[in-house]
Amino acid sequence: SNWFKNFLDGKSPGEGFFIEADPSNDYSQVVRPRTSPLLAEVETQRGPSHVWCTFSHDQVDLNFADPRVLIEILKVIRHYLDAGISILRLDAVAYLWKKPDHSCIHAEETHAVVRLIRLLLDQFAPGTLLITETNVPNQENLSYFGNCNEAHVVYNFSLAPLLAHALLTGTSCHLKTWMMSMPPAPPSCTYLNFTASHDGIGMRPAEGLLSDEEQHELVTTIESFGGKISRRSLPGGEEKAYELNISLFD
C-alpha cells in the first residue's frame, strides 16, 4: 500500500501507521491465528525495523493507537457509506488493538472502536448493518453484540464445526446442546448461520463444545478425506488446528 511505502520512507501519510515491536520482548501471551512469526523485519529509511503481522508477513497490522489511523479508517468507511452500502463487515476485528502484556485479542479498546463505528453508522446511515467476523470460541464471539451498541449481526461460527462433527459421527448431541444453550440475539440484532466459508471450517469455535479428543478425531477424519488443515501457534510453541479446509461435498 502507499501507506506502507511511506512508512518505510518515513513520509506521511504512513509514518507511524504501522506497529513496530522489539523482537527481544516476550510475546508468548499473544493469541495467534497462524504459525508464521509474529514479527517481520523490514528495511526502513531509519534502518531495520520489526513490524507486527497477526496473519502473515504480507498483511502488516495498522496501529490504531495512533489517532491518525483511526481517522483515516473512518474516512474510508464514510466513503463506502456515501456510495450506499447496506452492510459493513469488520474482518478479524478481534485482533485490532495491541498492547504490552496482553493477549492482543478482544481488547476493550477493540470493542470501543467497534462501538465508534456502530455510532457512525447509526448516525450517518441508519439501517446500515454492522457485522463482525470473529472466528473465536462461542462466548467470546457473542461479546461483539456489546450492549446492543456493537454489531447488528454476529456470525454463528460454532455451527460449522458442530455440523461437520454431527455428519461424520452420526450423532447430533453436541450440536443440539449448543443450539439449546444459545441465547436469543439482542433486540435489533441477529445471528448469521453459515456452514462453511472461503476460510474453511474454524476449529476455535468448537473449543468448550467438543472435547480435545473429539476435535482431534474430527481433524484426523478431515485429513483422511484429503482436507488440508491450517494451524495456529499456541503460547508454549505447539501447534493446533485452526481451520479445516474442505467442502461438505468432499
Model-found features: residue ranges?
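Active-site and adjacent substrate-binding regions of carbohydrate-active enzymes
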Residues: 1-250
